[in-house]
Regions:
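Non-catalytic substrate-recognition/targeting regions of SAM-dependent transferases
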Residues: 2-12
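The AdoMet/dcAdoMet-binding core of the Class I SAM-like
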Residues: 19-152, 161-166, 175, 195
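Conserved Class I S-adenosyl-L-methionine
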Residues: 140-144, 166-187, 201
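SAM/dcSAM-binding transferase cores
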Residues: 172, 194-258
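Short proline/glycine-enriched turn/loop segments at secondary-structure junctions
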Residues: 188-192
């Protein structure tokens, strides 16, 4: 953790910037509201894998429909550091709907009851070290089982400028798992991440044989939160626009799809 003149407090893990006070909201608002606002019915139960800085929890807790939020974070040190140095992000940990589970996210998803969650959000680091399993087939198969029909998964999906091969591999794998559903890539802009862009892979589980396309917002944006203030990035218009990719990326990700 260090203090930056331009970006405020900065959290770094293994030499990689994870969040800064100045621009973290663009990532947090999009990774939460893209999946939750795409649902046909408001979410009641959500699982967060990773997300120990608390930013995802903060944005989730804006949603009044939520009854319970589980978070599985493997590194308790991240939670403690965020509570001490980034309290504006960590405020979600104090919400009574939140249950914190320190441990392996893959194992937590494996142990979840079938169809238990409306949405699963994976706020992971890059696919190296302990986070590598969160980009592999067994994890996505477990998430598919753990969400209800009509539910949605949203994972940190890397950058089209740096990791297009990984994105194609993950989206192709997900289409084989979420058959009858929909798999899409969306992105947000965030200056302090490499290339200034980071994406999300969104997968929906078929209900009655009908795919739920995640690029259409069906739920309203959450109301202003008295402690967090209004949304600063997400809008319904930006929701739709986030799925419109540059030609080179759209071409690569469309290859092999019907």
């Amino acid at each position: 953790m260090f203090e930056s003149t331009s970006f405020g407090r900065v959290m770094v893990l293994d030499g990689v910037i994870q969040s800064t006070e100045r621009d973290e909201f663009s990532y947090q608002e999009m990774i939460v509201n893209l999946p939750l606002c795409a649902l046909e019915t408001p979410a009641k139960r959500v699982l967060v894998v990773g997300g120990g800085d608390g930013g995802v929890l903060r944005e989730l807790c804006r949603h009044p429909s939520l009854e319970r939020v589980d978070i599985a974070e493997i590194d308790e040190g991240v939670i403690k550091a965020s509570k001490e140095f980034l309290p504006h992000m960590a405020k979600g940990f104090s919400d009574p709907r939140v249950r914190v589970h320190v441990g392996d996210g893959l194992q937590f998803v494996k142990d979840a009851p079938e169809g238990h969650y409306d949405a699963i959000i994976v706020d992971s680091s890059d696919p190296v070290g302990p986070a590598a399993v969160l980009f592999e087939r067994p994890f996505y198969e477990c998430m598919h089982r753990a969400i209800r029909p009509g539910g949605v998964v949203c994972t940190q999906g890397e950058s089209i400028w740096l990791h297009l091969d990984i994105i194609k591999e993950v989206t192709s794998m997900c289409r084989g798992i979420f058959q009858g559903g929909a798999v899409s890539y969306a992105y947000t802009t965030i200056p302090t991440y490499p290339s200034g862009q980071i994406g999300f892979v969104l997968c929906t589980k078929s209900r009655d044989g009908k795919p739920l396309e995640p690029n259409e917002p069906r739920q309203p944006a959450p109301p202003m939160d008295l402690s967090s203030g209004p949304l600063r990035y997400y809008t319904p218009e930006l929701h739709r626009a986030a799925f419109v990719l540059p030609a080179f990326a759209a071409k690569v990700l469309a290859e092999g799809t019907s």
